[in-house]
Curated annotation (Swiss-Prot):
Gene3D superfamilies registered for this protein in UniProt: 3.40.1310.20
Organism: Maize streak virus genotype A (isolate South Africa) (MSV)
Protein name: Replication-associated protein
Cofactor: Mg(2+); Mn(2+)
Active site positions: 100
Motif (RCR-1): 18-21
């Protein structure tokens, strides 16, 4: 019956899919038609369903599915039929999977035309001998169609195209990231919310509402926030508690930039070591950056505010030219902390009992 396992982190991508429905007495013909309808968008070419009996007498169902385009799903329950949940695998050798399904079936149904595997990287069986050597395009097309993960994709390329793999690895890694993007986990904020103990909370609240908490027209530009003050006053914890963000400390590393972040944080980085400071402070969109050890890329598809945190001894404004300072003040709310201010409220102590 349907499994209760979580859908998180599940991913399947392949043009050849092998399904096993345990303890499933479903009619193979009915199951074939239901699975066929589920994958219409990927252009199904062939499906084989067979009912088989276990030694204990229980029935289970096997299915081999072949599509023109790779089936790409992230829902582990996608192939559930009539409450029965299958084990979903990539059929790396369709010939062997088909032979396995047809070994001892009680009932069989198939639709479409079976496509024998002609993969150059699995070796050649007697029925797959080809005099003509496959081209690089054919090899890559086959790898793209049958790889099920980033690691498998790169491993196949290394095996079949070793010279290209050794000289163009960064390009293959780039295509692997596009084919198999990482599944984003649901954001859980590790930083507890805090209430600033400031002389002028209103100015911070006035900045928070339109720039962090409220969605705005994509054409409008946000405004950044600059906070300068003593260390150990809770600036970083407060800034990081507001939501999903890009966080940089010591240096700005664009290689892990998250487009889904609501805002950026530049924490304790001297002004002279902050590249693209104008783009960050000005909440600009679609600008080019050059990640270390990576290729140039365009980031920030929409206007995104930046919170800049600095200690008094590295005040950015002291390092700026008059022209830079004018730009900074026009695009940034500036908050200079007063003595005694903190970005968290002091704990409320219980009243002491009189002795």
């Amino acid at each position: 019956m349907a499994s209760s396992s979580s859908n998180r982190q599940f991913s399947h991508r392949n043009a050849n899919t092998f399904l096993t429905y345990p303890k499933c007495p479903e009619n193979p013909e009915i199951a074939c038609q239901m699975i066929w309808e589920l994958v219409v968008r990927w252009i199904p070419k062939y499906i084989l369903c067979a009912r088989e009996a276990h030694k204990d007498g229980s029935l289970h169902l096997h299915a081999l599915l072949q599509t023109e385009k790779p089936v790409r799903i992230s829902d582990s329950r996608f192939f559930d039929i009539n409450g029965f949940h299958p084990n979903i695998q990539s059929a790396k050798s369709v010939n062997r999977v088909r032979d396995y399904i047809l070994k001892e079936p009680l009932a069989v149904f198939e639709r479409g035309t079976f496509i024998p595997r002609k993969s150059p990287f699995l070796g050649k069986s007697d029925s797959e001998v080809k005099e003509k050597k496959p081209s690089k395009d054919e090899i890559m097309r086959d790898i793209i169609s049958h790889a099920t993960s980033k690691a498998e994709y790169l491993s196949m390329i290394q095996k079949e195209l070793p010279f290209d793999w050794s000289t163009k690895l960064q390009y293959f890694e780039y295509s692997a990231n596009k084919l198999f993007p990482e599944i984003q986990e649901e954001f859980t904020n590790p930083h507890p919310p805090s209430s600033p103990d400031l002389l002028c909370n209103e100015s911070i609240n006035d900045w928070l509402q339109p720039n962090i908490f409220q969605s705005s027209d994509e054409r409008s530009r946000k405004q950044s926030l600059y906070i300068v003050g003593p260390t150990r006053t809770g600036k970083s914890t407060w800034a990081r508690s507001l939501g999903v963000h890009n966080y940089w400390q010591n240096n700005v590393d664009w290689s892990s930039y998250n487009e889904d972040a609501i805002y950026n944080i530049v924490d304790d980085i001297p002004f002279k070591f902050c590249p693209c400071w104008k783009q960050l402070v000005g909440c600009q969109r679609d600008f080019i950056v050059n990640p270390k050890y990576g290729k140039k890329k365009k980031v920030q598809k929409k206007s995104k505010p930046t919170i800049i945190l600095a200690n008094s001894d590295e005040d950015w404004m002291k390092e700026m030219t008059p022209g830079q300072l004018e730009y900074f003040e026009a695009n940034c709310i500036i908050y200079i902390m007063s003595p005694g201010e903190k970005w968290y409220s002091p704990p409320v102590l219980p009243p002491t009992e009189e002795v």
